[in-house]
Regions:
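M16 family metallopeptidases and their MPP-like homologs
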Residues: 68-101
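Short amphipathic alpha-helical signal-transduction/dimerization elements
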Residues: 56-63, 100, 104
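Active/ligand-binding-proximal structured segments within catalytic/core domains
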Residues: 27-61, 70-71
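Sequence termini and other peripheral, non-core segments
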Residues: 148-150
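Short, low-order "capping/linker" segments at domain edges
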Residues: 119-146
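Conserved short beta-strand edge segments in small beta-sheet-based binding/regulatory domains
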Residues: 104-118
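Non-catalytic beta-strand/loop surface segments
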Residues: 1-29, 60-73, 77-81, 136
Length: 150
């Protein structure tokens, strides 16, 4: 079998940030790396799950909603993938920054966190999710579209 593209990224050199991971036709895959790989600090499952619900809800209700294909966590718990169509790198970055601001400040019930709406609704940790989003925000806010490469 061929090695998939995400396994071709040298994780020993990868740091926190936002990167264009790949382009498949008109779909761009963004690597939103919240944790340095293999350094022992990972997103907890509760924080990652909560961030997933908040990020997906915000992105799919934003001005960029028609360009959002998918938002989801990495299995290694070091970040998220954002798949977009028709958004420029600057727009994808703006969407990500706005999403992280939303998540860092979120108060209330986590969207989709009920037995009817989610397959593991009890595994949520809003305080941890907010802290993780707040910790990532300064890094994202300092980026420009020209910085979004490995």
């Amino acid at each position: 079998m061929e090695r998939i593209a995400s396994f071709c990224v040298d994780h020993t050199r990868l740091d926190r940030g936002m990167y264009l991971s790949r382009q498949d036709g008109d779909v761009l895959t963004w690597d939103i790396r919240m944790k340095k790989p293999n350094h022992g600090d990972y997103l907890s499952t509760g924080a990652a799950h909560t961030l997933e619900h908040l990020f997906a809800t915000y992105a799919r209700n934003s001005q960029y909603k028609d360009g959002v294909v998918y938002v989801g966590p990495m299995g290694c718990r070091t970040g998220f993938y954002l798949l977009t169509r028709g958004l420029t790198p600057a727009e994808a970055l703006r969407l990500t920054v706005e999403s992280f601001r939303f998540m860092a400040a979120f108060e209330g019930d986590v969207p989709g966190a009920s037995e009817v709406e989610c397959g593991n609704y009890r595994d949520m940790d809003l305080p941890a999710a907010k802290a993780e989003a707040a910790a990532m925000l300064p890094l994202l806010e300092a980026l420009t579209a020209d910085d979004l490469h490995y």
